[in-house]
Amino acid sequence: MRRLSLWWLLSRVCLLLPPPCALVLAGVPSSSSHPQPCQILKRIGHAVRVGAVHLQPWTTAPRAASRAQEGGRAGAQRDDPESGTWRPPAPSQGARWLGSALHGRGPPGSRKLGEGAGAETLWPRDALLFAVENLNRVEGLLPYNLSLEVVMAIEAGLGDLPLMPFSSPSSPWSSDPFSFLQSVCHTVVVQGVSALLAFPQSQGEMMELDLVSSVLHIPVLSIVRHEFPRESQNPLHLQLSLENSLSSDADVTVSILTMNNWYNFSLLLCQEDWNITDFLLLTENNSKFHLESVINITANLSSTKDLLSFLQVQMDNIRNSTPTMVMFGCDMDSIRQIFEMSTQFGLSPPELHWVLGDSQNVEELRTEGLPLGLIAHGKTTQSVFEYYVQDAMELVARAVATATMIQPELALLPSTMNCMDVKTTNLTSGQYLSRFLANTTFRGLSGSIKVKGSTIISSENNFFIWNLQHDPMGKPMWTRLGSWQGGRIVMDSGIWPEQAQRHKTHFQHPNKLHLRVVTLIEHPFVFTREVDDEGLCPAGQLCLDPMTNDSSMLDRLFSSLHSSNDTVPIKFKKCCYGYCIDLLEQLAEDMNFDFDLYIVGDGKYGAWKNGHWTGLVGDLLSGTANMAVTSFSINTARSQVIDFTSPFFSTSLGILVRTRDTAAPIGAFMWPLHWTMWLGIFVALHITAIFLTLYEWKSPFGMTPKGRNRNKVFSFSSALNVCYALLFGRTAAIKPPKCWTGRFLMNLWAIFCMFCLSTYTANLAAVMVGEKIYEELSGIHDPKLHHPSQGFRFGTVRESSAEDYVRQSFPEMHEYMRRYNVPATPDGVQYLKNDPEKLDAFIMDKALLDYEVSIDADCKLLTVGKPFAIEGYGIGLPPNSPLTSNISELISQYKSHGFMDVLHDKWYKVVPCGKRSFAVTETLQMGIKHFSGLFVLLCIGFGLSILTTIGEHIVHRLLLPRIKNKSKLQYWLHTSQRFHRALNTSFVEEKQPRSKTKRVEKSRWRRWTCKTEGDSELSLFPRSNLGPQQLMVWNTSNLSHDNQRKYIFNDEEGQNQLGTQAHQDIPLPQRRRELPASLTTNGKADSLNVTRSSVIQELSELEKQIQVIRQELQLAVSRKTELEEYQKTNRTCES
C-alpha cells in the first residue's frame, strides 16, 4: 500500500509539472494497468458526455475574389420549425466523408473554411453528431470500451420548445448571462457532462461562457471564427480559432530563405492591400535580411502592355542587385503572365530565384508556363469546419482517457450536476480534467493540436515545400523537398536548389542505404515477365529468380549483376512489377535507399518446419534478406520472430469455388417466359379467336352466310388458325376476317405476338445454356468443411497464413485438407478450373481470390461464404530492425494522402467477369442437348396427330350418324365448315347431280354427217364444248361463244366448198356454276325439312332450265327444217 501511495503522490506532482513529466506516468503500475472501475462505469452508463451550447448556424463571409474557389458543403436537415422539435440530420456529403476523415482523405465537394464565392452556412449540430460518430469508431480512444455522447442545449432560436419560463422564442435565450447560466444548468449540466463545447459568435457570448466555466468549474472549449481578445486567463475556458494564422505562411517563407542563404531579396505584390506585415517583421528582426525593392504591379495587371513596360523598367533596376524574388497576393494566372514576361528579360532561374510567399493549393499546382527552380509551399488538404469540431471533441476524449488511468472517479464522475448545489471541494473533476487538456497534444484532422499558454488551442497545419524540377524523363514536375513541422523545416530526400547550384560542378551523391529485398510472386501484388534481349527491364524492376536461399550464392549473383562484366545467366533474370513493387519503389525514393530484389527460393511465405523457418521468414532470420515485400500476412507466429510494419493492405480469408453449367432440361425452351405468361398468352389467344368469330358473324360485311354473297365462311377454327399463325410467325395460308372490326382486332393481336416473341427470343440464349450451380458454403463453419462428405475436396496453400489459421483453429479440418494443399495460389485456382476438377473449394486470402475472379475469362470462379480471419499485409523486417518505425510512419502517410488508394485502383480496377459476359454469349454454341425438349415436343406432336386421325374416323363413323338423327344439332357452320358439311350431305344427294350431268353431256355432244356428190361431207359441230360442270345449276359462265355454226356446202358450179355462216342465237339466260344439290350459293346446306323459301327458289331454277332446253329444241327444229329443204333442193337439181 505504501508503494502505491508513493506512486499516487508522484502522479499528483507530475500534473503540476511541464508535459515531459507525463512520460514518467507511463511506467506507473497504477496508471498503466488500472483495474476496471465497474461501479463508476455503471453510474455513468459506460459513456463520457460532452455538452454543446450556442448551436446557432454560422454564416461565413466570402474572402477576396482572388482567393475564391468554387465548392459547396451539402446542407443537413434543418430543425422543423412547425413541430418545435429537433430531428436528426440527414447524412450529407461532408457527413458521409467524415467516416473516412480519420484516414486523412478530404471530403468530396466540401468547401474550405474562409473560401467560396459567397456566404456559406455552417451547422454546428451536424458537425457534432458526425464527430461523435467518427470518434466512437476509433478503437482505443477511450478506455474500458467507453463511448462518447453529446448533450445539446435546447435553444428556442433553432425551433426547439422552450423549457425554461425565462426563455421565449421572441427573444434570444442567452440575452441575459444569468438566464443563460440557468438554461445550461437545466438542459446540459444535469445530465453529467465532463466538458462543454461552444460555438460563440460575439464577445458577449464569450463572456457568458467565461461565467459558466468559472461558476460551474466545467471546462469549456469555444470554437470561434477568429480569436477573441480576453482579459482574464481562465484555464477552464479554451478557444480554438478556425482562422488560419498568416504568420504560418510568413514563418515558412522566412525559413525557406534562411535555409538557402537568400538574404537579399525583393518583393513583388499583385495586390496592394495584401497583408505581409508578419513577413516584414520577421525579416526586419533578422539583421541578415536585406530588402532591396518592392515591385507593386496591382495597377498594371489589367493591361498587358502597361505591365510589360513596367516590368521591364523594374527588372532592369534589380537585375544585378537582387538574386531572389518573393511573390505575394498573386494567383496562378498572374504568376504565369509574370514569368512569361520575365523570361523575355532573362530573369528566370538560376539568375533569379523565385519563391511564392503565399500558401498554395497543391492540387492546383501546374507546370505549364512556370520556370524550373520555383519554390512553393502549401498543404495537401485544406481544413473544413468539421475537422476543427472533431479535433476539439477528440481533445476532450484524449484528456479524459489519460485522466481516467490516474484517478477514474475524479475523471469520470462530474463534480457538478446540480447548479443549486455546487461543491466547493479543493479539486473538482473539471479542474482536474483541465490540467490534462493543457498537456494533451496529438495530430488531428485540422493540424497539430496543442494548447499554447493556458487558454489558446492551436491547430498548426503541416506545410509541404515543393520545387519545380525535371523528372527522370526530362519533363517538369513538382518535387517535394521537405515539410514544415513544429516551427522548422524537415528535409526530405533530395537536394535544394541552392545546394544544387553550389555543388553542380563537384556534386557527389550521398551514401545510400543498400538493402536486399525478397519477394514472392502473388498476383496482383507481384508479377514477373521475361527480360528483353539485352537482359534489361523496359518496365518494372530487375529481379533475380535463383531458386535458392543460399546467401553466398545470392552475393555472387548480385555482385556479378552490378559489375561491368555481367555474367548472370539470363534464365535467372526477371522483371518484377505489381502493387508491392510500386510501394517498394516509393519507399526507396522517400527513404533514400537502393535495393536488390530477388524471388524467394522455395516459393513459401514461411512456417516452422523441421526445426527451422522456411520461405520469407527464414530468409529474414538468416540475414539473406533485409526486407520482405509481398502479400505477407501478419500473424502471431511470424510476429514473434520477425518485425512487421503497420499493415498496408487489409484483407481476410475467403473460399473460392467453381461454377458449373448444368445441362438444359427438357422444358428449357419454355423458361424464357414464366408459366403464368405462357398461360396468359394461350388464354388471350382463345379469347381473341372467340371475339374474331363473333365480330365476323355479327358484321354485315363478314365472311358468313348472311354476308355479301361470300363463297367461303369464317368459322371459329379459321379464327384459331389465324391466331396461331400470327403467334408463331408461320407463313401458312390463312382465311383472314373480312369485317373491319375483325381486321383491327387481328392487327392488335399481331402486335401483341410481336412483343411476346421478341422477349422470348432475347432470353432464349441465356436460358438454353442451363443454370450455373456451385458449392454453396456459408463460411469456415459450414458443415461441408467440418464433416466433408465422400469426394468433397478442399485445400489451401502450404505454409501460408491460411493453413496456419486452420491448423490452430480447426485441427481436424486441417488434418483432412492436408492431402489437398497446393504449393501456390495459381495451382489451387488451376485445380478448380480443371476438367474434371481436382478441388471443390480453395481457401486463401480474399484479396488474392477476388483478383483471380476478376481476371477469369471463363467466368467460372466465385467467392462464397462470409469472410473470416481478418488480417493485414505488412512488410517483413528482421527482428529489432531500425527501419520498422520509419516505414510504418511512411505507410501511414501513404494511407492518409491517398497513395494506397491509387495503387489499389491501378492494380485492382479490372473489368468484372459479369461485365464481360457478352464475350461468352457471342461464341455460344448450342448442341442437341439444349434443344432436346423441342425434339420431344415434335415427337409428342406426331403421336397426337395419329390420335387425331383415329379420332376423326371415330367421329365420322360413330358420332356423325347420331348427331344427324337430332334435328337441333345440325348447324355447325360457325364452328367448323367441314363438320357442318359432313352433317348435311349424304351419298344419294351427291350421286344424282353426277348422273344428270353425264346425260346432259351426251345430249350436248352430237355430231351430224351428210355426204354429198364429190364425196363431200357436211359436219355439224356443237356450238360449244361444255365441261361437266357447265350444265350445273350454279354455273355462272356465259354462252356468248355458242353463236357460230359451221356449214359444208357446194356452190352453183357443183364444187364442194366450205363456208361459215354466222348465226345469232337467241340469248340464253345467265347460268351459275352448279354446286352439290345440298348447297346454296354461299355454301349453306339445305335441311331435310325444306322450307317454303327454298322450294320456291328451286322451282325458279327449274323453270330457267326448262326455258333453256326449249330454246335449244326450237333451234334444233329450225335447223332440221333448213336441212330438209336443202336436201330437197339437191335432189331436184339431180333430177
Swiss-Prot record:
Tissue: Isoform 1 and isoform 2 are expressed in olfactory bulb, frontal occipital, entorhinal and pyriform cortices, hippocampus, striatum, thalamus, cerebellum and spinal cord.
Coiled coil (residue ranges): 1080-1129
Post-translational modification: N-glycosylated.
Alphabetically ordered keywords of this record: Calcium, Cell membrane, Coiled coil, Disulfide bond, Glycoprotein, Ion channel, Ion transport, Ligand-gated ion channel, Magnesium, Membrane, Postsynaptic cell membrane, Receptor, Signal, Synapse, Transmembrane, Transmembrane helix, Transport
This protein's record includes keyword Coiled coil: yes
Stretch list, region GIT1-binding: 1082-1115
Disulfide bonds: 537-575, 543-576, 859-913
One GO molecular-function entry: protein phosphatase 2A binding
Region (PPP2CB binding site): 951-987
Entry protein name: Glutamate receptor ionotropic, NMDA 3A
Family stated for the protein in its record: Belongs to the glutamate-gated ion channel (TC 1.A.10.1) family. NR3A/GRIN3A subfamily.
Compartments in which it is found: Cell membrane; Postsynaptic cell membrane; Postsynaptic density
Species: Rattus norvegicus
Glycosylation site list: 145, 264, 275, 285, 296, 300, 426, 439, 549, 565, 886
Transmembrane segments: 675-694, 742-761, 933-948
Membrane-topology descriptor: Multi-pass membrane protein
Secretion signal span: 1-23
